Amino acid sequence: SQLTITDSEVGSSKIYCEVRRGESLWIKEIPDCKGDIVHPTVILTQTSSEEITSSRFATVVCSIIDFHPEAITVNWLKDGHPMESGFVTSPACETNGNFSATSRLTVPAREWFTNTVYTCQVSHQAATQSRNITGSPDSSECNHPAIKLLPPSIEQVLLEATVTLTCVVSNAPYGVNVSWTQEQKPLKSEIAVQPGEDPDSVISTVDISTQAWLSEAVFYCVVSHQDLPTPLRDSIHKEAWKDLREPSVSVLLPPAEEISAERFLSLTCLVRGFSPREIFVKWTVNDKSVNPGNYKNTEVMAENDKSSFFIYSLLSIAAEEWASGASYSCVVGHEAIPLKIINRTVNKSSGKPSFVNISLALLDTVNSCQ
């Protein structure tokens, strides 16, 4: 025989089991079972956004703690609808007379950050508890792949037959594919590599002709991955600049008192009045390149009219080298210069710095003007 009572009736009065057989009668009092029912504590936890991005899956753990008796039912809902798969519930384990269990839900990363509500529903002794969790779309935006395109250096554009475009993909998932196209034409590019300092980024480069870059053709970096609904694309091209302005270049000699008193001297190259802002400035000594660590270029800054720019370069040299008669040249490259490169050379014999325009072909054999 079986008797079903509600939770509220447990302990409200004494319960007896009565058995008759012929003239015989047995009566048994049923012990109060109120203390035997302990409803569980239900807690939901999830993996971090970083783990979701790297593993491409979100894991939600529903912890069901300290319940008695053992019988329990766990269901998962997605936006209020029962789920048939994607979760595993472990058998209950007994500790100090009570039971605990866990249910683990796994969701693909592409579904997690879509504002979907997942519910762990726990039923125990006719009582049901529900806990909800939502993948935040705001969090996902920080972890979506992002594309940054870098143009070639102005020095490469002015001096070389080919230039390099760079595509940096941050928050890149494992196995991401990066490709390049010119308009709709696929380009052969270097395989994307992950730099050691940022394991969540990949870098892809493509070499194109300088002529193609100067033609203002449009180049696309395309990022694809199985977790992306559609490939990501970004474009880069050389911007047309109508107001070209050629820079003026002057080298300031060290003052006489500095030459006689100091072990190290400073030469200053002032480049101003140019537009657009892309420019390179470097130094040579006796027609050989100076180590970039020996000079410092300022940032390119706008002049008062806001339509042109200027930059300083400061070269530190040993006083004895200056005294030996070495020739120092400030070499400036800019697209508005007719031959692309301009060179100013000074030495200890210079009353004023000399001025030379040099072609690309002669750059490596710059001759000092006396």
Swiss-Prot record:
The segment(s) forming the Ig-like domain are 40-134, 145-237, 247-347
Name the SMART domains on file: IGc1
| Keyword flag Repeat | yes
- Transcription regulation recorded as keyword: no
Q: Which UniProt keywords apply?
A: Glycoprotein, Immunoglobulin domain, Repeat
Q: Which Gene3D superfamilies match?
A: Immunoglobulins
Q: Which residues are glycosylated?
A: N98, N132, N177, N343, N347, N357
Q: Which InterPro entries match?
A: Ig-like_dom, Ig-like_dom_sf, Ig-like_fold, Ig/MHC_CS, Ig_C1-set, Immune_Resp_Modulators
Stored PROSITE patterns: IG_LIKE, IG_MHC
Protein name as annotated: Ig heavy chain C region
Q: To which species is this protein native?
A: Heterodontus francisci
